[in-house]
Amino acid sequence: MRLPRILVALAVTAAVGSTACGAEVQQPAGAATGAAVTVTNCGAPLTVEGVPERVVTNDTGITEMMFALGLADRLVGHTSYPGKERDIASSPWKADFERTPLLGDAFTREVVQAADPDFVFAGWNYGFKESTGLTPDWVRSIGAVPYQLTEACRQPGTDRRGVMEPLDALYTDLANLGDIFGVRARADQLIAQYRDQVAKAAAGAPAGQEPARVFLFDSATAEPFTSGRHAAPSQIIREAGGSNIFDDLNDSWTTASWEAAAQRDPQAILIVDYGAGPENSVQAKIEQLRTHPLMAGTTAVRENNLLALPYAALVEGPRNPQAVVTVAEFLRSRGY
């Protein structure tokens, strides 16, 4: 079926490609001195004794942060999710993925322990879950350091996630990793580049015009899974000149309702492309929107203002700044 005026951006690579290879990464200072480094991670001090040498990561965006910092040689392996091949194919760090052992599509205690890591980088609902017993405390129990993705830090006294602006979470993790691995100059270079990229995209938003209402559609069974205020898409949309219709939800990735989504009448819809299975494909999600009795009448669906971006562009990671550029260009092309 021909889908007019639907832009499916399978790769967010143009502006991040320059950071994907050829970076001169300084020798970690801790490798020579053995000095301990303490950073703040999810509101608590985290001390790392020396530079980690056997790192396990979970999820594409997390792994790409290590690659962007030039730390591929520190990884003993990574885990991902079924269908990640599309994410990896579109990655500016594809060559690093090909050189790094894939430990599997499941982040489990058995997989992690078998890799004998000294540092595990994951996040709540990005691998860490009480239901599986794979938690930061368990990582400590096997003698490794757990580092938590800042986008997924839990708010005090609750399991809701998000304690700062999503892009600030990215910059925080890059700076922390820079300190831990002795590559802070590289981290600062990336942070400055990303801030500049985002600022230039934000400056292009039309003056005197209400931001476009944007719905982030991740997936759905009974109700849609979407981005609240603290997930990366909310700030990506805002910096691009739009407004996340669920920015009032004090969480990161969370469940909303079709009724609420339709009532807020999105003018554009941002679709997460997992590249996984026919039931979770971009095409299937588009058909779901077009045939849904409430969503079919929204401005975004009627006018085919639908943009798909790779999963790794929309979770915290080094593709976020280019995602801002891509969403901004899309909104401008639709008159917003």
Model-identified regions with their sequence ranges:
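Short helix-initiation/N-cap motifs at beta->coil->alpha
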Residues: 41-43, 100-110, 130, 250-257
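A short, structured surface patch at a secondary-structure boundary
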Residues: 54, 59-115, 119-120, 124-128, ...
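Short helices/loops that flank or line small-molecule/ion binding pockets
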Residues: 108-119, 134-137, 142, 256-265
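Structured C-terminal subdomain patch of bacterial secreted/periplasmic proteins
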Residues: 164-173, 248-249, 270-336
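Alpha-helical, coiled-coil/dimerization segments enriched in small aliphatic residues
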Residues: 226-253
